[in-house]
Amino acid sequence: MHNDKDLSTWQTFRRLWPTIAPFKAGLIVAGVALILNAASDTFMLSLLKPLLDDGFGKTDRSVLVWMPLVVIGLMILRGITSYVSSYCISWVSGKVVMTMRRRLFGHMMGMPVSFFDKQSTGTLLSRITYDSEQVASSSSGALITVVREGASIIGLFIMMFYYSWQLSIILIVLAPIVSIAIRVVSKRFRNISKNMQNTMGQVTTSAEQMLKGHKEVLIFGGQEVETKRFDKVSNRMRLQGMKMVSASSISDPIIQLIASLALAFVLYAASFPSVMDSLTAGTITVVFSSMIALMRPLKSLTNVNAQFQRGMAACQTLFTILDSEQEKDEGKRVIERATGDVEFRNVTFTYPGRDVPALRNINLKIPAGKTVALVGRSGSGKSTIASLITRFYDIDEGEILMDGHDLREYTLASLRNQVALVSQNVHLFNDTVANNIAYARTEQYSREQIEEAARMAYAMDFINKMDNGLDTVIGENGVLLSGGQRQRIAIARALLRDSPILILDEATSALDTESERAIQAALDELQKNRTSLVIAHRLSTIEKADEIVVVEDGVIVERGTHNDLLEHRGVYAQLHKMQFGQ
């Protein structure tokens, strides 16, 4: 099996073809139009022979009467075919790019969390936008040039051989030399194109970091650092572009030099008496004009090669992502609503790409309807435990059970439907407040249910003050809201979801003391009759938990109730003393 980076242009295009095939009707129409367009140019040149031999050579004035009409007709045909071909190719190109982007977008949504841990957002955005657009270049502008100029070359060759095969046969020597030159340049174009795509991802990442962290940049005076970083990747992109221009600029004169040598040799051969006797003024003019006309399509084909190779390199990059293994969803068990029993048995887990396990031999039972709190220092593994319940990652050893069945037995959709998550890193969408609360299920919930969830999360106070209430668009990631307001929207979302298992990962971390007190009552109500896993730094929020589990360096070191752990005077007692000074 070939690696994508080793695929030839032909193999890459063959793989792209199934994406293009549904729109081949547009390609056929465009191809016919392009061939007619090239034929009109070739036929225009062929008119030189009757014009010189008959119109002027024999003073046959009838040629000068009908020829202007033919020229006008050919120009009209040329204009129509040019429009039809451009429109059809652009239509096909747009469809192909949309299809590729949808496939890429859908495939990325099915990728495991570990995939996104390794990739920068800017690079992935570049794949969906820039690389997909490069595919358009290969399937639109490049294709137009290849078909039109290819048809022109074939037409000119046929016409030259028809009028003087002796002179035209010399050009056969030209074909393999030009082919070798194009192949060498193609390899160079593709290598540069791959580097340009990677660099474009770095440019996007640099810009994205500045835009998302512009407040931090301003506060910490990072303008110079960010400017230097962006200048560095931008200059790298410029250098790659210059390499592309250099390769293209060198290939043009090489191709033209080869063609010029062939033309010079033809001119020399035409001086031989045996050849000259068979030529008329019109014939030799048509042959020489055709040879000169060959320069343009040869140059265009050489130039379009750079564009085509960029598209093929982009295809390979996209295929690399599309070939990446998606999240494993091999479970068959579907459950409408779980009871909520969760159990970890001898679970060991290591993050992909790391050597040291994040969790070691975790044994933990969370009975249905009970609340278990995880505490510990930052990086101890608390959030990792929570992420394993939703199977964002698969464990190395042991098993995790829900209602007595291994999580891997459930379909991912069914499993995740049992869990509501409120984390410290709330993500909101550039949509209305109502649609954010009822995210992905706007048609399932009534307006009254959405309002009730917002009220229980103590969010209606600030929502009612907005211009359009629940219909207010809150900007990208809730940029128009405060941290506490964003957190309450997320809690309202969890309330509305009404899942049997609840994960609260620092759910009140962004709230002020007053808001925290107000919302704690709602969280207490939410946790009733639900299996709750609460992760908290503020120990005051988990004192009423049925069990508190202390995690240190990926290992459970203590467990018990709040009072039991204080009496034990272990790690939990130390953490409590640090927070409350007792």
From Swiss-Prot:
<keyword id="KW-1003">Cell membrane</keyword>
<dbReference type="GO" id="GO:0034204">
    <property type="term" value="P:lipid translocation"/>
</dbReference>
<dbReference type="GO" id="GO:0006869">
    <property type="term" value="P:lipid transport"/>
</dbReference>
<dbReference type="InterPro" id="IPR003593">
    <property type="entry name" value="AAA+_ATPase"/>
</dbReference>
<dbReference type="GO" id="GO:0043190">
    <property type="term" value="C:ATP-binding cassette (ABC) transporter complex"/>
</dbReference>
<keyword id="KW-0547">Nucleotide-binding</keyword>
<dbReference type="InterPro" id="IPR036640">
    <property type="entry name" value="ABC1_TM_sf"/>
</dbReference>
<keyword id="KW-0997">Cell inner membrane</keyword>
<dbReference type="InterPro" id="IPR027417">
    <property type="entry name" value="P-loop_NTPase"/>
</dbReference>
<dbReference type="GO" id="GO:0016020">
    <property type="term" value="C:membrane"/>
</dbReference>
<dbReference type="GO" id="GO:1990199">
    <property type="term" value="C:MsbA transporter complex"/>
</dbReference>
<dbReference type="InterPro" id="IPR017871">
    <property type="entry name" value="ABC_transporter-like_CS"/>
</dbReference>
<dbReference type="GO" id="GO:0008289">
    <property type="term" value="F:lipid binding"/>
</dbReference>
<dbReference type="GO" id="GO:0005886">
    <property type="term" value="C:plasma membrane"/>
</dbReference>
<keyword id="KW-0812">Transmembrane</keyword>
<keyword id="KW-1133">Transmembrane helix</keyword>
<dbReference type="GO" id="GO:0042802">
    <property type="term" value="F:identical protein binding"/>
</dbReference>
<feature type="domain" description="ABC transmembrane type-1">
    <location>
        <begin position="27"/>
        <end position="310"/>
    </location>
</feature>
<feature type="transmembrane region" description="Helical">
    <location>
        <begin position="140"/>
        <end position="162"/>
    </location>
</feature>
<dbReference type="Pfam" id="PF00005">
    <property type="entry name" value="ABC_tran"/>
</dbReference>
<feature type="transmembrane region" description="Helical">
    <location>
        <begin position="253"/>
        <end position="273"/>
    </location>
</feature>
<dbReference type="InterPro" id="IPR011527">
    <property type="entry name" value="ABC1_TM_dom"/>
</dbReference>
<feature type="binding site">
    <location>
        <begin position="376"/>
        <end position="383"/>
    </location>
    <ligand>
        <name>ATP</name>
    </ligand>
</feature>
<comment type="similarity">
    <text>Belongs to the ABC transporter superfamily. Lipid exporter (TC 3.A.1.106) family.</text>
</comment>
<dbReference type="GO" id="GO:0055085">
    <property type="term" value="P:transmembrane transport"/>
</dbReference>
<keyword id="KW-0067">ATP-binding</keyword>
<keyword id="KW-0445">Lipid transport</keyword>
<comment type="function">
    <text>Involved in lipopolysaccharide (LPS) biosynthesis. Translocates lipid A-core from the inner to the outer leaflet of the inner membrane. Transmembrane domains (TMD) form a pore in the inner membrane and the ATP-binding domain (NBD) is responsible for energy generation. Shows ATPase activity. May transport glycerophospholipids. In proteoliposomes, mediates the ATP-dependent flipping of a variety of phospholipid and glycolipid derivatives. May also function as a multidrug transporter.</text>
</comment>
<dbReference type="GO" id="GO:0034040">
    <property type="term" value="F:ATPase-coupled lipid transmembrane transporter activity"/>
</dbReference>
<protein>
    <recommendedName>
        <fullName>ATP-dependent lipid A-core flippase</fullName>
        <ecNumber>7.5.2.6</ecNumber>
    </recommendedName>
</protein>
<feature type="transmembrane region" description="Helical">
    <location>
        <begin position="63"/>
        <end position="83"/>
    </location>
</feature>
<feature type="transmembrane region" description="Helical">
    <location>
        <begin position="275"/>
        <end position="295"/>
    </location>
</feature>
<dbReference type="GO" id="GO:0005524">
    <property type="term" value="F:ATP binding"/>
</dbReference>
<dbReference type="GO" id="GO:0016887">
    <property type="term" value="F:ATP hydrolysis activity"/>
</dbReference>
<dbReference type="GO" id="GO:0015437">
    <property type="term" value="F:lipopolysaccharide floppase activity"/>
</dbReference>
<comment type="subunit">
    <text>Homodimer.</text>
</comment>
<keyword id="KW-1278">Translocase</keyword>
<dbReference type="GO" id="GO:0015920">
    <property type="term" value="P:lipopolysaccharide transport"/>
</dbReference>
<dbReference type="InterPro" id="IPR003439">
    <property type="entry name" value="ABC_transporter-like_ATP-bd"/>
</dbReference>
<dbReference type="InterPro" id="IPR039421">
    <property type="entry name" value="Type_1_exporter"/>
</dbReference>
<feature type="transmembrane region" description="Helical">
    <location>
        <begin position="167"/>
        <end position="186"/>
    </location>
</feature>
<feature type="domain" description="ABC transporter">
    <location>
        <begin position="342"/>
        <end position="578"/>
    </location>
</feature>
